[in-house]
């Protein structure tokens, strides 16, 4: 137990407009007990820890998921300290409310401005909560798909009441944060890499 190697913990910030279902998504992903009768209160700030199976030989990776207060009205920017520490961002919107998608463009611009030249994965989740009124939802989701393609970010359709819909976005994100170590086929390079790892230990 003392010799167990502790892997890097990926820090993921979940953000978006107030009332789009960020907390319900996280609670369902981590605990799996959210249903339409579950009472959730507006979030100030919460932290969840999830152990994620990325499907790579049974190895589990750890995500620390930060749930933030929803943005609304005049406050359409994330506080600056939220932009400094995350390794990845999950942007959530409700396709029934086009304003929630518009707000994500501002959040993404802030992330780009403060990322300090490092590659930070960003994922967009459409939290489809109601099956009624497909036309407005489809128009908003078409806009979201076009925007995500232009920004080169992944766009997923999920439902906070359906836990399996949340697996793919978070396992993919976790795999990007914890890439597999590749072994070189060149013996000389492999020897250099092994020597470097020994000197770092």
Swiss-Prot record:
GO terms for molecular function: GTP binding; GTPase activating protein binding; IkappaB kinase complex binding. GTP binds at residues 16-23, 67-71, 127-130. GO terms for biological process: negative regulation of canonical NF-kappaB signal transduction; Ral protein signal transduction. It comes from the Eukaryota. Keywords: GTP-binding, Nucleotide-binding. Coiled coil: none annotated. SUPFAM superfamilies: P-loop containing nucleoside triphosphate hydrolases (SSF52540). The keyword Transcription regulation does not apply. A motif (Effector region) lies at residues 40-48. Residues 3-201 are annotated as: Small GTPase-like. The keyword Nucleotide-binding applies. Pfam families: Ras. In contrast to other members of the Ras family, the members of the KappaB-Ras subfamily do not contain the conserved Gly and Gln residues in positions 18 and 71, which are replaced by Lys and Leu residues, respectively, and are therefore similar to the constitutively active forms of oncogenic forms of Ras. This suggests that members of this family are clearly different from other small GTPases proteins. Interacts with NF-kappa-B inhibitor cactus. Atypical Ras-like protein that may act as a regulator of NF-kappa-B activity, possibly by preventing the degradation of NF-kappa-B inhibitor cactus. Belongs to the small GTPase superfamily. Ras family. KappaB-Ras subfamily. This is NF-kappa-B inhibitor-interacting Ras-like protein. It comes from Drosophila melanogaster. The gene is kappaB-Ras.
